[in-house]
Amino acid sequence: AAVPSGASTGIYEALELRAVEHINKTIAPALVSKLAMQEFMILPVGASSFRIGAEVYHNLKDATNVGDEGGFAPNILENKEALELLKAGYTDQVVIGMDVAASEFYRFTASAGIQVVGDDLTVTNPKRAASEKSCNCLLLKVNQIGSVTESLQACKLAQSNGWGVMVSHRSGETEDTFIADLVVGLCTGQIKTGAPCRSERYNQILRIEEELGSKSFRNPLAK
């Protein structure tokens, strides 16, 4: 099972961090990427299987480095350059997602017509996030929110406010496949679980898909 806290922690989470000054002044400058945004992702919203997502992933095979979640980490300097890499010929079937790791990004919700996924705030205080209309989709991390029961409650709260729900893994956790079963059980239609080479959850979803047959596919983002 996954540990209570992963490698990615946010501003609304208790955290003990030793040698803070050394990390901030010596280690961080040597390791931190030049990109302003934390992650660039693909969402194969027009797909009926994982094939399209996998093909976009393999289209980036010339990128050099791989992160702990299986994603490519090429040496690029600008956000635009990262976006230009996400091409595999599926212009109408794949949309781009970005983890901006920002605490104040909700102003885009009303004007841009995009899905804004809340992370730390929705975990610690989903009622506040809903009342402030800070986002329109919940990123559901079971090992961050605390329990399966609390996860179900958060999902219901999000859906009652007209939000989407994206079930997510967490950096640094185990290969446990439970969230694959959870996302199918909740019928949210969205899962964030790293690149295809981290295949445990994808394989579990494929097994569930095979068992459910024609009743398996659900696309909440389809217009």
UniProtKB/Swiss-Prot annotation:
Mammalian enolase is composed of 3 isozyme subunits, alpha, beta and gamma, which can form homodimers or heterodimers which are cell-type and development-specific. ENO1 interacts with PLG in the neuronal plasma membrane and promotes its activation. The C-terminal lysine is required for this binding. Interacts with ENO4 and PGAM2. Interacts with CMTM6. Mg(2+) 1 binds at S8. The active site is at E69 (proton donor), K141 (proton acceptor). It comes from Mesocricetus auratus. The modification Phosphotyrosine is found at Y12. ISGylated. The keyword Secreted does not apply. GO terms for biological process: canonical glycolysis. The gene is ENO1. Residues 202-223 are annotated as: Required for interaction with PLG. This is Alpha-enolase.
